[in-house]
Amino acid sequence: MGGYLAIVFIPQTNTKSMREKKQKCLKQVRRLSLISPKKYIMPDSIFEQPFVYCGVCHRRTSHGDPLRLTSCAHILCSQHSPLTSKVCPICRSSDISIINLVESKQLPTDIRIFFEPLPPLLESLYNVSQFQLNGLSKQCQYYQNHCLKLREKCARQQQLLYQAKIELDSMAILKKRIQELESVLNHNNVSSMSVGVLPTRNSHQNHYQPPPTVDLTVDDNSLEEFEAKSFIKKLKKNSSLRNSSKNNNGTVTPSTSGRVNKNQPLFMETLNNPNRNSIPPPGMNPNANSNLPNISTIAESTNLNRFSFSPVRVAKGFDGKLPNLDILTNNGSVSSKNISRLSSASLQPSSPLSSSSNRLILPNSNLKELHHSNTPLTSTSTQFPSALEKLKITRKRNNTISGSNRITHNLSSHVRSSGLAFSSSSNSLQQSKLPKSNILKRSNSTQQLTNTHLKSDNHLPPRSSNTVLGSSKKNNKFRRIR
């Protein structure tokens, strides 16, 4: 029995030895289970077992004389148990307590367990030990597997930590490299900004060229002379009076002089005496004035603003044709309607000149045609003559002298000269009773005077529109044409 107890309660730490001991224990338990019903007979009382006897005389229990148990764990019979002294005869311990081992008496559980038979205790112990061993083995297997997983996980984490450590160690080097590159980049930007300012401006100027400018530096004297000459030439070439004299070639058509308004004696006097108005130009034969228009007549065509015209309409003659009353129009063509307007105009002087200076002078051919025409003149509209549209001078705010302003200045100078010629021609009409020699002398003198005024005006610097307006206010004779 002692061998069984030693096998069961030996602690086993090694797994292999534990398995071997377990197998041996199982074999012994099987052996005991086979022997107990045949050879090992269970006693009727628990106190009749072989290990229960007196420690001094080795006597077993009986019904009349039961055994006794001391507090020091010794069994004594009635003879050897102390009655008065409380000293154990086996161990000599003092002050002991004694209890009778009787079946009828209920013993405490902690005392009764000492007298339980061993096979049931071993079986229960085996079951308990088997249960505990299985639980412990499973727990060990679980922790073993978990430990393996944790080892693998730790190995992976170790690799990650190693890589992170390498990256952290390289971050300091990379930060230094970034700072170096940023410093180089900033230096390059500053240098490019300081050096690249001029090229960008030059490129901007190359892409966007400045706008073209107009050259205003012109020789005034040469330009005025050229424009004055060209204007006079154009006026001579495009003059309706000159063209009409060339086209007619001395032919005379019947006119309507008999039906002209009677309130215009000066105009009728001019129509009746056309040869009075001719002033020979310098260097030409006075006898040739019948074929060419007079300079005074050409000059008077630009000075028609002195009269307040009442527009008229020229009716057709007996032959079904309009009277050949030609005057300059806007485009230089011939218009008979405009000369009819001029012929029927009421001549009202607007300047301090004499009334005789306001007479309209026409070429001989046109005067004859108007004198012999018998068609009446009736007023229809109030439109300004289209022949004077070219001679309008527009007012501009800009005082800079352009090409158009220079032309208007030359026109104003020509108007001034034409005013003198007009006054001279009117004086010649008033003094028609004088001898022809005096008329020729006076016409020559007036022609020279107009030439001198033309030259002086050509040499003068170009005038602005404000200057012309100021001069017109001072002298109504040089009024601008609007």
Curated annotation (Swiss-Prot):
Region called Disordered, residue ranges: 239-263, 418-482
Induction text: Expressed during meiosis.
GO biological process, one term: double-strand break repair via homologous recombination
Biased composition range(s): Low complexity: 240-249, 418-437
Molecular function GO terms recorded: chromatin binding; SUMO transferase activity
Protein keywords: Chromosome, DNA damage, DNA repair, Meiosis, Nucleus
Residue stretches of biased makeup (Polar residues): 250-263, 440-453, 463-473
Compartments reported by the entry: Nucleus; Chromosome
Domain of life: Eukaryota
Main location: nucleus
Function: Component of the synapsis initiation complex (SIC) necessary for the synaptonemal complex assembly. Stabilizes the ZIP2 component to the chromosomes. The SIC complex loads onto chromosomes and nucleates ZIP1 polymerization, a molecular zipper that acts to bring homologous chromosomes in close apposition, which is required for meiotic crossover. May also be involved in double strand break repair.
PANTHER family found in the cross-reference section: RING FINGER PROTEIN NARYA-RELATED
Subunit structure: Component of the synapsis initiation complex composed of at least ZIP2, ZIP3, MSH4 and MSH5. Also interacts with ZIP1, MRE11, RAD51 and RAD53.
Protein name: Chromosome stability protein 9
Organism: Saccharomyces cerevisiae (strain ATCC 204508 / S288c)
Lineage, uppermost ranks: Eukaryota, Fungi, Dikarya, Ascomycota, Saccharomycotina
